[in-house]
Amino acid sequence: MAAAPPSYCFVAFPPRAKDGLVVFGKNSARPRDEVQEVVYFSAADHEPESKVECTYISIDQVPRTYAIMISRPAWLWGAEMGANEHGVCIANEAINTREPAAEIEALLGMDLVRLGLERGETAKEALDVIVSLLEEHGQGGNYFEDANSCHSFQSAYLIVDRDEAWVLETIGKYWAAEKVTEGVRCICSQLSLTTKMDAEHPELRSYAQSQGWWTGEGEFNFSEVFSPVEDHLDCGAGKDSLEKQEESITVQTMMNTLRDKASGVCIDSEFFLTTASGVSVLPQNRSSPCIHYFTGTPDPSRSIFKPFIFVDDVKLVPKTQSPCFGDDDPAKKEPRFQEKPDRRHELYKAHEWARAIIESDQEQGRKLRSTMLELEKQGLEAMEEILTSSEPLDPAEVGDLFYDCVDTEIKFFK
């Protein structure tokens, strides 16, 4: 398999983002044939001393986990991106650093995304959860469903709530983080922190010295110290794609950015594809609900972003969930990944038809894509009404919001 291209995630704060909204977006660049599912897990109480089984290892469970909505490769436990009931959003990026990532199975970066969402009521709390679990359990194991070789990475995270974001970058159990409260920030699959660090592992600098990567003299620049000597990734055009927007950034701007293939933000190559995308809108006014949009299908330029709002009685959406193989899943048996089961969910299968038409028939494909975008626009307009309304949100009206959007999309494709 060729080297993985960069994934991108972005956050924009007011006043760069419009109407007092924090806007968050993420593209997940993964192997072309990998299916991502979108799954809701309700808040739950857990027995004392119970365990939670992550992708490769089990760890201690906490007494209570928050409700989450996540987009994840269907073979693993964690998440590429997601949100929780408190308006915390997290996405991660696989990164290469001077220190090779561990192939020994531990927590995956994606596991830490989900654990942060389940356990963190604010962005800072989620950050603290992730770094403490990193210290305790480490990170490692195969990031891809591939029996032939182990693709292991270090991880970077963008952790966002209504008030602030944290950029967290990790090297093994060592880490540094920067707090962001204004402007636009992008992380992609390389280190980005330099000399501004608002929190760090207590032994980070002494570790860098022990490896001969820093003399201990002069200013400590995280990226310079820990980036690989030969870093061929160029994230420049992608990073600039949102920052160079002259107008205020809206949810539509973020979606357009994630659909941009020319800048490299949207990946469509021989081995890799943007397999799922997500956008979240977090109003700084707490009387307005956070709204989270997920595609659940590959290639955002040929997909529909569908809205979801956390309420007490969410209608589950089995049509975006992959089949469950239980203990027979090749990802759970050792040696792992000896087979690749069909993980396509109902929405994914319906969407394959649309992708084929858009790729093969110019006229019909253009009309189909135009109709898809019109469907999406109707959803965006309905959400805009909710955000600008002075009336309190009626939970009964939005509990089946994502379900209805998925159902409409599948019927449309059929």
Curated annotation (Swiss-Prot):
Name of this chain's protein: Secernin-1
UniProt KW Glycosyltransferase keyword: no
Family, per entry: Belongs to the peptidase C69 family. Secernin subfamily.
N-acetylalanine modification, residue list: A2
Function noted in UniProt: Regulates exocytosis in mast cells. Increases both the extent of secretion and the sensitivity of mast cells to stimulation with calcium.
GO cellular component, one term: presynapse
Pfam family, one: Peptidase_C69
Record-annotated active site: C9
Major site of localization recorded for this protein: cytoplasm
Biological process, per Gene Ontology: exocytosis; proteolysis; regulation of synaptic vesicle cycle
Name of encoding gene: SCRN1
InterPro entries for the chain: Peptidase_C69
Annotated compartments: Cytoplasm
One Gene Ontology term of the molecular function aspect: cysteine-type exopeptidase activity
Remarks, miscellaneous: 'Secern' is an archaic English term meaning 'secrete'.
Keyword terms of this UniProt record: Acetylation, Cytoplasm, Exocytosis
